[in-house]
Amino acid sequence: HPVNIYCEKYVEDTLRQDYSYAFAEPKYPGSPEWHVHIIDSRHNISVHSNRDEEILVWEKGFGYKHFPAQAGPVPAPVEVVPIQGWHLNDTSMSVLGYRFGNIAYLTDIKHIDEDGYEKLKGVEYVTLGCVKREEHRSHPSLQQCLDFFERVGAKESYITHLSHLLPKYEEFCRELPPHVHPAWDGLVIGGED
């Protein structure tokens, strides 16, 4: 089954350069099939369900298993709000965060502009990356992360992209405000939208 890739134009250009075999015609047997959808951060996008296709699910002790598409009505498309961010202190490396209803996910983002904060108004759950307490060239410091969470005002905030330079989970939890949590593998963030 084809993989849908949603990205900015420069990312597509890099994919076509680094993985030219995946875009070559005629298709090489066994090469991936990618459908690239270009995102412009000024416009929301709708992502449609692929429930008519088989899905791969990880089963502990077995590995990945194929499952048929779920029966029932196809869910409505999800509106995705791209949030323009930058991976460095300047604006030389564009990176996008996303808002899905009342959930926002921004990783590998050093900073966003005022328009980004506008798009985050009313979000209930937000995730931001932080690799260490101190300033990092491409990630916010822990204090910058906490300031970001305070400004956004979400009900629950999660820190991802954690490194060994931050405390162990239990200790880190004790240091953080009650509504800020270190993220973990397998975390499911709730939301009605």
Label the predicted regions:
Residues 1-105, 171-193:
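Binuclear metal-dependent hydrolase catalytic cores
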Residues 8, 88, 109, 162-165:
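Short beta->alpha junction loops/turns
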Residues 91-96, 100-129:
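Active-site-proximal loop/helix segments of hydrolase catalytic cores
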Residues 113-193:
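Binuclear metal-ion centers of metallo-dependent hydrolases, dominated by the metallo-beta-lactamase
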